Amino acid sequence: MTNTKNIVKKAKHETAAPSTAPTSPALVVSPPASPPLKQPRRALPWIVISAILSIVLITIVVSAGVYLYVNTHRSTTLTPTRDGNTTATASEASVSNVIEKVSPSVVSIVTNTTKRTIYGAAQARAAGTGIVISRDGYILTNRHVVANASAVQVVLDDGTAYDDVKIVGVDPLNDVAYLKINGVTNLRAAEIGDSSTVRTGQHVVAIGNALGQYRNTVSSGIISGKGRSLSASDEAGGSNESLSDMFQTDAAINSGNSGGPLLNYAGQVIGINTAVASGATGIGFAIPINAVKGTMKSVLAGNRVKRAYIGIRYVDITPALAKRYHLPVAKGAYVASDDRSSVQPDSPASKAGIQDGDIITKVNGTAVGESNGFSSLIGQYTPNDVVELTILRGGKEQTVKVTLGAYAE
């Protein structure tokens, strides 16, 4: 079956594995009987997100390509040569041209896992998607695509299969994993875009290994919303996780698509397809690509996954939240918590003097808001980077510099 957060109630799809082999349970999310949906769990459940749509989701396994500007030594630029999100509609390339450009960078991922049953150990297979991010075999996908895998196979668009594949790192907070195909030097990497300039209503394309059977299936749609927060679990009610700052799209994201690319019409990767709403049509979600640029830099430099860490608990401010709690701004990150300190002791934030009740409005001059959630903005950086935060404290604006730490799993 596909290893995904899936929209189907019985989210089980057979792969090419023998019928006697059990399939992996898909991550399932069931919506409540009626809206509004229950809030996702975050560090701040008390204030969190009366405005947040909490949807039970199923993760979707998909693979996509990221065209990075790399030479044979894997020197990589994560800044696109142009902003493909603001291209005028009249000059947008056709979907077919986008697919022609990106398909070689989108791979199918097949995993083997061992499951314990009342009859003993049994082998199960699952399928998802991935994105080529370097010529020498680094692949970006969702963590849930390769979770508990004993073996991983990567299949290119032309059918070439590689079995010498290792999981080189995971970022559980972003549901991201990195794979490495050993012994390759000539893969085509996908081009990484800039998710900070994505517009609601913008046309997008999704590619993935639909149902684990239909390699590089293409769908198209628009960005339906930004800054979504979600809560997801598997079919058994386990594997609960919260995801924030997500893009919402009506481009079809099928079981098996998790880990694949969400693309603008310039053929740039702007998101990683990750989840769909259960019991709904045309509601899929993708992780903004900027949120993983920091860990991507770390992996491409030959290091393990290192996620930048600041050490605060906060609430994303919305206009409704600002009105309810009489906050001075309608957007930003409100440093607050319910029953714990909102600034962790000895953290980078603590050392920089961040205090409970501060409102962070900018990161290195970029406004915190719907298009640029605080976690996504920090996710662009790596440990030891210094960022300047603009904050409101007692009604007065000031700036502080924070040296980011490394998140410890």
Predicted region positions:
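Flexible, small-residue-rich helix->loop connector segments that border functional cores
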Residues: V98-I99, G357-I360, L389
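Intrinsically disordered, low-complexity Ser/Thr- and acidic-rich flexible linkers and loops
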Residues: T117-G120, D339-S347
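N-terminal targeting leaders characterized by basic, low-complexity, disordered sequences
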Residues: M1-P35
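Acidic- and glycine-rich mobile interface elements
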Residues: N186, A333-V343, T361-T366
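Exposed beta-strand face motif in extracellular beta-rich ectodomains
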Residues: D385-V387, Q398
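Conserved PDZ fold ligand-binding element
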Residues: I139-L140, D346-S371
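Serine-dependent protease modules
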Residues: T2-T4, V8, R42-I49, L53-R324, ...
